[in-house]
Amino acid sequence: MLASLIIFVALLCNVTVISGLNDEGFALLTFKQSVHDDPTGSLNNWNSSDENACSWNGVTCKELRVVSLSIPRKNLYGSLPSSLGFLSSLRHLNLRSNRFYGSLPIQLFHLQGLQSLVLYGNSFDGSLSEEIGKLKLLQTLDLSQNLFNGSLPLSILQCNRLKTLDVSRNNLSGPLPDGFGSAFVSLEKLDLAFNQFNGSIPSDIGNLSNLQGTADFSHNHFTGSIPPALGDLPEKVYIDLTFNNLSGPIPQTGALMNRGPTAFIGNTGLCGPPLKDLCQGYQLGLNASYPFIPSNNPPEDSDSTNSETKQKSSGLSKSAVIAIVLCDVFGICLVGLLFTYCYSKFCACNRENQFGVEKESKKRASECLCFRKDESETPSENVEHCDIVPLDAQVAFNLEELLKASAFVLGKSGIGIVYKVVLENGLTLAVRRLGEGGSQRFKEFQTEVEAIGKLKHPNIASLRAYYWSVDEKLLIYDYVSNGNLATALHGKPGMMTIAPLTWSERLRIMKGIATGLVYLHEFSPKKYVHGDLKPSNILIGQDMEPKISDFGLARLANIAGGSSPTIQSNRIIQTDQQPQERQQHHHKSVSSEFTAHSSSGSYYQAPETLKMVKPSQKWDVYSYGIILLELIAGRSPAVEVGTSEMDLVRWVQVCIEEKKPLCDVLDPCLAPEAETEDEIVAVLKIAISCVNSSPEKRPTMRHVSDTLDRLPVAGD
């Protein structure tokens, strides 16, 4: 630091001889002097003979004052000089992915107008100064992938405008400061992974109501129980608590519900759902998770001596045993009579209507419903449900209301007809009618549909209820009014115009799809594979938030007799929009290792799906990569080149081989947004890695999602 100050003073002494540079210009020259290696020559045009520094690479000025210094990914090697403190108007400092080392100068924290400090991917070390609390306007703090140590200073809570806090992959330790959750109510991204943090997770963590993506506490040394307040985080947030020292029952509240066991692995002391380990010895927690277990039940781990004593003291007399047996026999007979009565009612029910259910059955629907999903065990394979079977506690409609509703066809496919249904109360639903077979496979159908119904995530289309009979199977979803991604990108026959998606909208869609797939792959009960991901299966909800649909549909259709398991589903739930169409112009480029794939099957299917192999999550990664290419290029997966046709992956490969500029690959509708070029290139590189012909070389969806989360979306 002393050396940099001497250099700075020496430069100031020569100000009249050298040029008219102001103090900020000389501060930047001191920064250049502190860089010992500049292999790309990124600082070559930083010359003392210039009138000001505003034309230098990486420097942005406003009214001749430096407001931004951004020199990422240049492999610069050096340290930060204290002279940076003279950049009094600096708002943004981005030095990510270089080779800077040493501690951060205290003067850096005196830049009270600083809004973003992005230093990830360097070798900075030392502890964070208490002076950091002076950065009251700071919104982005990314210090990940460095060598920082010590604890988070208490003063960091004064940076209460933070939206991004990423200190992952350092050597930070100690507990999180008290009041952590209450201080950062504006926080949208939190990543504390791969450090040495210890102590308990703050009880006020649920106050982070604006969090998005993944709240990552993984690979630390957090102890104690999981605070129930953690469930108060938005449902869209993934909570990663893996590989800590947490113990006790997992609270079944809010964002912690419907999480698969992978979110909690590496914590040997945790118990209760979704883990298989029951909470022995945590009586209060056990009752919280299982409300029907009385609090005076003895613990299961009582010693054998006590157990034997209890067995002796609780023995039953012969008369009591005989009475119990007689009651059981009477009960079985009563159940048999009830079942016979209900079965006769089932056979009397006749169904045919606008979905295949006859109008006269409306009057008898309530009589037929003897077995509801929440009232009894599954009946025989030939059972017929005469009412809607809800998969969501909020389902408040029945079959009779559904039959009275106005309905019209939205589309048809090989897996049945899709209707838009508007109930009398205004609720709009999408109803898919499956085949008329599968009468002997009810249990199989029920198992599948209930598993799908448990998937609750903002980026997964919700299956609300179903209906089953020998002649009819209906799947009932929330209606999504903005159509699907295929229509949003390319229009459909009969459309005259279509409003092009902006880059921000496309990026939001990319992130949402990735987030939904991460949920399917890592947080769903069985680590599912979608297997049929394509734009027509991506519905567009409010604020351009995507919803992945048709998960498990091909399997259900096969059970219902509507299709072969090899037929790919093609959901056609679309909006009542104005007729639109887009001309297919389009174009872009960048380099990486990948191999094109083309076959007579779906362009979205990975090459290995042509072999009879077990479904893999890497299939979905490949399909996602094709969708990314489609969003960037604005082209269909089959590209017309002259009189011939080429698949999109091969077309991009040709553009790279011919070293075409990015604008030749980019959708022309995105051309005016030239300032987003770095983001587009970053996404293109992700897409290319996703469509690698080798499944092992494709990234996981978690890695893809985390990478995309680093890219800001306008309006977020």
Swiss-Prot record:
Q: Where is this region: Disordered?
A: 575-598, 695-716
Q: Quote the biased-composition stretches of kind Basic and acidic residues, using this chain's numbering.
A: 695-709
* Chain ranges passing through the membrane: 320-340
Q: Which compartments does it reside in?
A: Cell membrane
What outcome is documented for mutating K534A in this protein? Loss of kinase activity, but no effect on GB1, CAM1 or CML8 binding
Leader sequence residues: 1-20
Summary of the tissues where the protein is detected = Expressed at the micropylar nuclei of the embryo sac at eight-nucleate stage before cellularization, but not in chalazal nuclei. After cellularization, expressed in central cell and synergids in mature embryo sac. After fertilization, detected specifically in zygote, endosperm precursor cell, and later in endosperm. In addition, also present in sperm and the vegetative cells in both pollen and pollen tube. Expressed at high level in the egg cell, the central cell, the endosperm, and at low level in the zygote.
What keywords were assigned to this record?
Cell membrane, Kinase, Leucine-rich repeat, Membrane, Phosphoprotein, Receptor, Repeat, Signal, Transferase, Transmembrane, Transmembrane helix
Modification note: Autophosphorylated. The kinase activity is activated by the binding of CAM1 and/or GB1.
**GO BP, one annotated term:** protein autophosphorylation
- Zinc keyword on record: no
Which chemical reaction does it catalyze?
L-seryl-[protein] + ATP = O-phospho-L-seryl-[protein] + ADP + H(+); L-threonyl-[protein] + ATP = O-phospho-L-threonyl-[protein] + ADP + H(+)
Which family, according to UniProt? Belongs to the protein kinase superfamily. Ser/Thr protein kinase family.
How does the record describe its quaternary structure?
Part of an in vivo complex containing ZAR1, CAM1 and GB1. Interacts (via CaMBD domain) with calmodulins CAM1 and CML8 in a calcium independent manner. Interacts (via GBeta-binding domain) with GB1. Component of an immune signaling complex made of, at least, SZE1, BKN2/SZE2, ZAR1 and ZED1. Binds directly to SZE1 and SZE2 at the plasma membrane.
Q: What is this protein called?
A: Receptor protein kinase-like protein ZAR1
Originating species: Arabidopsis thaliana (Mouse-ear cress)
What gene is this protein translated from?
Answer: ZAR1
